């Protein structure tokens, strides 16, 4: 199950007791997937940075999970929908994705490079069509929504489904034992060839809210 929290940093996740809560319910053979790096770059000052408090906190996650016989998995942050003039994704996470790759190699932890997979995904979709994977809706799409929604970080159901497929493909390519439980008809996923939007069906909940989540 998920204990994720919007706008969280590894160090704040630990400080809020959420890691401790997860550890109390963790059993040998469980998996802990850690995807951070979106909000960490806002942290400035002594001891902050990708190769300082960020990496130290992630090392705590890894050590605590392994001490309980669980499998830690590092997941680099999804790209933001930020294109340059040539239709290529701009890197907006500074050196945080690279720090996670370095830590994964050093600690021999499986890595799902969602940062690179989503670069491929968004560029394959294109500048305008990629809006269909995000919370981009004209005013009046939902009850009480009086303004345009243009969020280039958070996904709508179609986008979230493509990201989920990236994670599943990452699990398979990393050779994690949990991949043995994938459906027998799973044929893989290539982010360079995302599912057609009209092939995705989703029934909206009757309950909606239009507040943008924290984080960017």
Residue spans for each PLM region:
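Short, small-residue-biased leader/transition segments that mark boundaries at the very start
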Residues: 1-9
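Alpha-helical cap/lid subdomain in secreted, periplasmic
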Residues: 17-183, 205, 212-216
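A short, charged, Gly/Pro-tolerant segment at domain boundaries
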Residues: 184-202
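Structural motif
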Residues: 10-17
């Amino acid at each position: 199950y998920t204990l994720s929290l919007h706008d969280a940093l590894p160090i704040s996740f630990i400080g809020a007791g959420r890691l401790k809560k997860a550890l109390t319910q963790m059993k040998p053979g469980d998996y802990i997937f850690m995807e951070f790096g979106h909000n960490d770059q806002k942290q400035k000052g002594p001891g902050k940075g990708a190769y300082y408090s960020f990496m130290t906190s992630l090392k705590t996650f890894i050590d605590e999970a392994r001490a309980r016989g669980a499998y830690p998995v590092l997941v680099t942050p999804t790209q933001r929908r930020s294109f340059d003039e040539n239709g290529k994704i701009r890197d907006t996470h500074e050196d945080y994705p690279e720090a996670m790759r370095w830590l994964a190699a050093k600690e021999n932890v499986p890595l799902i490079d969602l940062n690179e997979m989503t670069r491929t995904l968004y560029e394959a979709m294109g500048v305008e069509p990629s809006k269909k994977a995000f919370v981009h809706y004209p005013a009046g799409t939902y009850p009480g929504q009086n303004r345009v929604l243009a969020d280039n970080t958070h996904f709508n159901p179609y986008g979230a489904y493509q990201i989920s497929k990236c994670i599943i493909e990452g699990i398979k390519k990393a050779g994690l034992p949990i991949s043995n439980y994938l459906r027998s008809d799973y044929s893989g996923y290539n982010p360079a060839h995302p599912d057609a939007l009209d092939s995705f069906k989703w029934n909206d909940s009757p309950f909606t809210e239009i507040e943008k989540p924290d984080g960017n």
